[in-house]
């Protein structure tokens, strides 16, 4: 799940930079990892990760779909709102799984100093 947290942070940084191509990629990565976690880790420290109930998955499905729409629309204002809803859903899921001490939030700055989150100006142009 730590990898999901990394994608969650990179999703914010990409959206904030209006790099919609990267934001779409990070969102797809998150969705893929959440799906894989259910299959690959049926339990983690006695928590039924692989048996997340429909309510838990619905908690995430709505915000994920809303984020996808905002990315497609390139709508930064509503992207921020949708991102915060996803973050709330992540924290609600943690509460449900009895790990509410893991609190996710918007990143404050970037720890990914080797990655440029600004969109490329044109195809084929090397990043700064």
Residue positions per predicted region:
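Sequence context surrounding c-type heme c attachment/ligation sites in exported
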Residues: 1-128
